[in-house]
UniProtKB/Swiss-Prot annotation:
Quaternary structure, from the entry: Binds to the central extracellular domain of APP and inhibits beta-secretase cleavage of APP.
Signal sequence segment: 1-28
Name of this protein: Spondin-1
Keywords: Cell adhesion, Disulfide bond, Extracellular matrix, Glycoprotein, Metal-binding, Repeat, Secreted, Signal
Cell location: Secreted, Extracellular space, Extracellular matrix
Region annotation Disordered: where it falls in the sequence: 732-752
Glycosylation sites: N214, N681
Database matches in Pfam families: Reeler, Spond_N, TSP1_spondin, TSP_1
Disulphide connectivity of cysteines: C44-C128, C156-C182, C199-C336, C200-C340, C202-C415, C443-C480, C454-C489, C459-C494, C502-C538, C513-C517, C548-C554, C559-C595, C570-C574, C605-C610, C615-C650, C626-C630, C660-C665
SUPFAM superfamilies reported for this sequence: TSP-1 type 1 repeat (SSF82895)
Function: Cell adhesion protein that promotes the attachment of spinal cord and sensory neuron cells and the outgrowth of neurites in vitro. May contribute to the growth and guidance of axons in both the spinal cord and the PNS.
Length: 807
């Protein structure tokens, strides 16, 4: 007895992926299955078109995300590969991504979006447009698509695949056909240590780094610095694992410090070049003034660099200006894959990080060096209430920039010879080799012809070609290389959603015919409304010409005129304006009448929409003098609007400012206050008194020298009397002095009338080494006699000059 095979329906539990293979055979579904399909309301009700039971084959098939990450960065692009290990194969598949613990029966259950790489291999499912399936059922061993990670706050996501090998054999959803990715905490971006494996790739690869700044008043309005906002020049390199330019948790080098605080890449480049054995390419790109404007999207700063097996990492940084020491960049980004190949594309959203050298908390905080220096760390929304990124709820910081790293060529023998997609065959066509002209000197060529039209007539990738002729081969034993050159290109007619194409305005009406009678030419124009988002050049024509015939027949009254001259510049720099052109009468009419032919024409002209291109500005002036005469200051430069009335409001900065450093400021000598005047050095007659001051700060850096530290002035005591009574008094004092001297010799201390004194102390050190200083010594009372009537029993102090020789 033959049983009808029961149709199989994909589980609507945590399974996130289903695989469908359209087969020619008609399938019979049970009523129960159809009821379940109807209950799903038509949203991704996926019926697996296979007649059989699920097989165990998870060692044969695998679902991998390039780099094998456990976390995803919101908005980043990841290459997803579904493959079969030879000799296994598969004919059909389905790939889908859902939020964790979601069933997939609602639109909001799905996470991220897929991008098709090869339309001949893959397509979106007609009944479930968020899922990817095969374009045609045939034997294959691998397919690839890009998955764009969902926005912040999505949580964990599960990618799942189902595979149909034959009509009665299928594998679904579990084991190696499932990949779980969780959202990466932006505050830990790049902080977690990740092992850098030895690279096994062969040959070299060439990449282009493109930097898209997104830091603007619209995206980051709090305290946004309207003046002098900019990104400094990009500096970095491709290097080995033995060299670190910068890393989270490490300390900034002097080069990193100068980039972070001054925006100067000079020291950083010097440090990189000193590591010549560990560095393959120094990466440099221009600065952006201001930090965001449309031209930064159309022609974003970019730089090309190469990597090899030893030097397969790349790092770079650029300063947000003005800021204390804030930067963005990548550290040790590995471009080598575990499959011994080279990563095709890296897209990273960037948040700012602190270099740990300045403690400012706002864009324009005054200089405040961090002592001791702190480690490099990412900024967070809870750092400081005055921070422009502060959020009391602790949310993630909005990305300030995006960097795109694309592989543009591979050179030399490659280990992984399977192309990542069909476009690799075009993308890897010899652009690397064109950097060095290896044409033998014995081969003489003509110049290259112009590039041909793109081979694709629709908005798809194609090739264009140019040729040259071999004029002479001077040595027949030396072969001459190619006479044809190919380059990838995009065909015309792309839609507005295509980031690599232009958006054009409608054609302006045809101009008048160039002649007043007979056959002439006319033209019309259009303008670029939106340049390509990827910064490529717009190749679509902006002008068309065609022949025109004026019905009026040329008669004897007709005149001969020259060709029209070139059109004058449009009277407006943006929006609608007028332009003129002129011609001259070469020969007047034969009948002597006036020439009726036009000799001047005027027509409307359309420039790009106002504020979509940079303003028409004069060149920058020279930098002004530093705002200070010594130490740290600021300097500025200006530019002017060339056509203010026509342009209207212009948001471009007309002034720039940067830090400047001059020699240290002089420090003058600092002195203490004057001391009190000393006692007069004479008890009668003329004498002098002294006062002093001390040096508290010696002069530095050419400061004012120290003035005098000792001053003298005359003093007069009572007149010295010579009367007998005075003479007797002196004799009495002399007698008492002799008696005191005797007592002093008898005792261990000195004795004055009425008291006994201790010996004089030693003289103090001189207050100056030269130019006149003073010394002091003291005598103190040791014992007072009760019967003494003398009042001179008190502590004594003596002062004398010292080091009076000139300095």
């Amino acid at each position: 007895m033959r049983l009808s095979p029961a149709p199989l329906r994909l589980s609507r539990g945590p399974a996130l992926l289903a695989l469908a293979l359209p087969l020619a055979a008609a399938l019979a579904f049970s009523d129960e299955t159809l009821d379940k399909v109807a209950k799903s309301e038509g949203y991704c009700s996926r019926i697996l078109r296979a007649q059989g039971t699920r097989r165990e084959g998870y060692t044969e098939f695998s679902l991998r995300v390039e780099g094998d990450p456990d976390f995803y960065k919101p908005g980043s692009s990841y290459r997803v590969t579904l493959s079969a290990a030879p000799p296994s194969y598969f004919r059909g598949f389905t790939l889908i991504a859902l939020k964790e613990n979601r069933e997939g029966d609602k639109e909001e259950d799905h996470a991220g979006t897929f991008q098709i790489i090869d339309e001949e291999e893959t397509q979106f499912m007609s009944n479930c447009p968020v899922a990817v399936t095969e374009s045609t059922p045939r034997r294959r061993t691998r397919i690839q698509v890009f998955w764009i990670a969902p926005p912040t706050g999505t949580g964990c996501v599960i990618l799942k695949a189902s595979i149909v090998q034959k009509r009665i054999i299928y594998f679904q959803d579990e084991g190696s056909l499932t990949k779980k990715l969780c959202e990466q905490d932006p505050t830990l971006d790049g902080v977690t240590d990740r092992p850098i494996l030895d690279c096994c790739a062969c040959g070299t690869a060439k990449y282009r780094l493109t930097f898209y700044g997104n830091w603007s008043e619209k995206t980051h309005p709090k305290d946004y610095p309207r003046r002098a906002n900019h990104w400094s020049a990009i500096i970095g390199g491709s290097h080995s694992k033995n060299y670190v330019l910068w890393e989270y948790g490490g300390y900034a080098s002097e080069g990193v410090k100068q980039v972070a605080e001054l925006g100067s890449p000079v020291k950083m480049e010097e440090e990189i070049r000193q590591q010549s054995d560990e560095v393959l390419t120094v990466i440099k790109a221009k600065a952006q003034w201001p930090s965001w404007q449309p031209v930064n999207v159309r022609a974003a700063p970019s730089a090309e660099f190469s990597v090899d097996r030893t030097r397969h990492l790349m790092s770079f940084l650029t300063m947000m200006g003005p800021s204390p020491d804030w930067n963005v960049g990548l550290s040790a980004e590995d471009l080598c894959t575990k499959e011994c190949g080279w990563v095709q594309k890296v897209v990273q959203d960037l948040i700012p990080w602190d270099a740990g050298t300045d403690s400012g908390v706002t864009y324009e905080s005054p200089n405040k060096p961090t002592i001791p220096q702190e480690k490099i760390r990412p900024l967070t929304s809870l750092d400081h209430p005055q921070s422009p990124f502060y959020d009391p709820e602790g949310g993630s910081i909005t990305q300030v920039a995006r960097v795109v790293i694309e592989r543009i060529a591979r050179k030399g023998e490659q280990c992984n010879i399977v192309p990542d997609n069909v476009d690799d065959i075009v993308a890897d066509l010899a652009p690397e080799e064109k950097d060095e002209d290896d044409t033998p000197e014995t081969c003489i060529y003509s110049n290259w012809s112009p590039w041909s039209a793109c081979s694709s007539s629709t908005c798809e990738k194609g090739k264009r070609m140019r040729q040259r002729m071999l004029k002479a081969q001077l040595d027949l034993s030396v072969p001459c290389p190619d006479t044809q050159d190919f380059q990838p290109c995009m065909g015309p007619g792309c839609s507005d959603e295509d980031g690599s194409t232009c958006t054009m305005s409608e054609w302006i009406t045809w101009s008048p015919c160039s002649v007043s009678c007979g056959m002439g030419m006319r033209s019309r124009e259009r303008y670029v409304k939106q340049f390509p988002e990827d910064g490529s050049v717009c190749m679509l024509p902006t002008e068309e010409t065609e022949k025109c015939t004026v019905n009026e027949e040329c008669s004897p009254s007709s005149c001969l005129v020259t060709e029209w001259g070139e059109w004058d510049d449009c009277s407006a720099t943006c929006g609608m304006g007028m332009k003129k052109r002129h011609r001259m009468v070469k020969m007047s009419p034969a009948d002597g009448s006036m020439c009726k032919a036009e000799t001047s024409q005027a027509e409307k002209c359309m420039m790009p929409e106002c504020h979509t291109i940079p303003c028409l500005l004069s060149p920058w002036s020279e930098w002004s003098d530093c705002s200070v005469t010594c130490g740290k200051g600021m300097r500025t430069r200006q530019r002017m609007l060339k056509s203010l009335a026509e342009l209207g409001d212009c948001n471009e900065d007309l002034e720039q400012a940067e830090k400047c450093m001059l020699p240290e400021c002089p420090i003058d000598c600092e002195l203490s206050e004057w001391s009190q005047w000393s006692e007069c050095n004479k008890s009668c007659g003329k004498g002098h008194m002294i006062r002093t001051r001390t040096i508290q700060m010696e002069p530095q850096f050419g400061g004012a020298p120290c003035p005098e530290t000792v001053q003298r002035k005359k003093c007069r005591a009572r007149k010295c009397l010579r009367s007998p009574s005075i003479q007797k008094l002196r004799w009495r004092e002399a007698r008492e002095s002799r008696r005191s001297e005797q007592l002093r010799e008898e005792s261990d201390g000195e004795q004055f009338p009425g008291c006994r004194m201790r010996p004089w102390t030693a003289w103090s050190e001189c207050t100056k080494l030269c130019g006149g200083g003073i010394q002091e010594r003291y005598m103190t009372v040791k014992k007072r006699f009760k019967s003494s009537q003398f009042t001179s029993c008190k502590d004594k102090k003596e002062i004398r000059a010292c080091n009076v020789h000139p300095c």
